[in-house]
């Protein structure tokens, strides 16, 4: 079982429950072969201001973004139990969900899954990598009872 530390650094109130987050992450782990020694994850729900600061500092991109992933970088010789950290801009997730005619819960599930896959080394820079990552997200979300997040 993974230990998830959830931090609330936003006034946004319609956040997913810890039990839902645990279910989403545990389901993702069923589809992936990963380091069995890793068992911790931090998710920080943030506002647009903090998201903008982090996005500009770490990705050199202006404005807020929905999710940022920070894989754990252990000190050599000291094994780490953490997969890393996710920073999720809750107000932006809600706005995107509304614009895409999705429930906020479905969009949070998608972005937590998406961010967690980044922590596991998946990316979407190249087209075939993006296709692999999206297909995995679709399978995980389907297992959780959510629709394909990429269909209009």
UniProtKB/Swiss-Prot annotation:
Record key words, sorted: Cytoplasm, Endonuclease, Hydrolase, Metal-binding, Nuclease, Ribosome biogenesis, rRNA processing, Zinc
A Pfam cross-reference name: YbeY
InterPro entries named among the record's database cross-references: MetalPrtase_cat_dom_sf_prd, YbeY, YbeY_CS
Predominant cellular place of this UniProt entry's protein: cytoplasm
Annotated cofactor note: Binds 1 zinc ion.
GO molecular-function term, one example from the UniProt record: zinc ion binding
One of the protein's GO biological processes: rRNA processing
Enzyme Commission designation: 3.1.-.-
Subcellular location: Cytoplasm
NCBIfam families: rRNA maturation RNase YbeY (TIGR00043)
Identification of the protein by name: Endoribonuclease YbeY
Biological classification of the source: Bacteria, Pseudomonadati, Pseudomonadota, Gammaproteobacteria, Legionellales
């Amino acid at each position: 079982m993974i230990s998830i530390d959830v931090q609330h650094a936003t006034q946004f109130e319609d956040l997913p429950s810890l039990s839902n987050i645990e279910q989403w992450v545990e389901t993702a782990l069923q589809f992936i072969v990963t380091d069995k020694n890793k068992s911790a994850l931090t998710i920080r729900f943030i506002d647009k201001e903090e998201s903008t600061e982090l996005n500009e500092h770490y990705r050199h991109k202006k404005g807020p973004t929905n999710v940022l992933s920070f894989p754990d970088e252990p000190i050599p010789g000291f094994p780490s139990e953490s997969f890393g950290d996710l920073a999720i801009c809750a107000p932006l997730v809600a706005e995107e969900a509304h614009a895409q005619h999705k429930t906020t819960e479905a969009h949070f599930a998608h972005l937590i899954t998406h961010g967690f896959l980044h922590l596991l080394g998946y990316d979407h820079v190249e087209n075939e990598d993006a296709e692999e990552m999206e297909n995995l997200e679709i399978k995980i979300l389907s297992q959780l009872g959510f629709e394909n997040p990429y269909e209009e």
